């Protein structure tokens, strides 16, 4: 049985779906295998903030009962019914706490489900639990979580990326075949790059944001985390579609993603190298894997062209004015009055202003406070036009740069992150160094275009995963899945299998970490 469980957790979501449909395995067996894996390794990885065993197994049992009954009950099941999934703890769920990685929401339970969660429930996908993140999704390493950092399954002393390091680590550690994340400046794609997983930021508005606790509303986007490009396509088709509860939701159906992932060729497609998104400042091992991917795509029949987006050099600066400005506004609701923690001032008059001040001082971490201060300043009278207004003008220029680039290429390509995963604590006291991790991912959020990161191999210097990023015009998410699936297939042929097959045995790593800790305490 142990061998069966170990085999089950390593299957892709698509493979699990096929095995479930043929009744080769049961949904309860699949779900229990992943719950057992969480119990075995998550004490060291810390990918999950909450595990929902009882509900997940109950949903799995419903799926098994429907398949056993046959007839219409079985026919009406979604293709992914019974395939378990993890959800980033920024997305609200009935019956489970939603903390946003913050002390200010510790123990809070939402009275409603996010739209994407409703869709998971409708598809009867067992929700394993809620994953760790940087507080309110503000960070690039998951070290800013109030509940401790998540560790990278490739090396437990390294970061798993952020803000959605919990979702990426859960998938990389085989604790879940699929996960949901949110991406405001790279929070799905950058963790994907450093953990060897696939992360997708859909077109802005392609997936409803209703029920995702807002960080920066004009930038936030929910998207899939998986181990294969096809799995991400399958999940995006589940969670996508128009939602009247989200005023920015698109009416486009986006129902051609799985078909695109199965096309199997890139012959005749033009793939543009973004001049400003590689080269100086990028780790040599990252550049080497990037150049290999370019050659492989060229060998597969794609035409490689170079494009320039000159205003991308201003993207980081514009982002760190727009994003904190929206953070300042969105986080004003967390005041200790209606929900979340409440801290009373120790002395003096008990006014609502003083209660709010005491609550926010105690409930928010340093990074959240830093961004609220930056945003409040940027929006203040006398500075609005100089900072926020100017940043929005730069955003328009970046959008125009992408329009021009896509007139020359079907898809753009770059490294996802400038380096591989760095050591825990290495950049925690240097905000600028931390912010630079998202230099290649931020532009897609500013422009509202879709982006996909897939594993591009291992860096020569440290043997850690490198991510390759693909970008497409708005509403053309299918192009990402077509090119991504082909590149993934070619790379896996080169490696002799999926990149995660080369990851260290996590159980051995965990046992080693436990032994080291025990030895150090003597």
UniProtKB/Swiss-Prot annotation:
Q: Which UniProt keywords apply?
A: ATP-binding, Ligase, Nucleotide-binding, Protein biosynthesis
* InterPro entries cross-referenced by the UniProt entry: Amidase, Amidase_CS, Amidase_dom, AS_sf, GatA
Q: Which organism is it from?
A: Paenarthrobacter aurescens (strain TC1)
Active site as annotated: 88, 163, 187
- One GO process term, biological-process aspect: translation
Q: Which residues form the signal peptide?
A: none
The answer to whether the entry has keyword Endoplasmic reticulum is no
Q: What does this protein do?
A: Allows the formation of correctly charged Gln-tRNA(Gln) through the transamidation of misacylated Glu-tRNA(Gln) in organisms which lack glutaminyl-tRNA synthetase. The reaction takes place in the presence of glutamine and ATP through an activated gamma-phospho-Glu-tRNA(Gln).
Record-listed E.C. numbers: 6.3.5.7
Q: Could you tell me what this protein is called? A: Glutamyl-tRNA(Gln) amidotransferase subunit A
Give the record's family classification.
Answer: Belongs to the amidase family. GatA subfamily.
A GO CC term attached to the entry: glutamyl-tRNA(Gln) amidotransferase complex
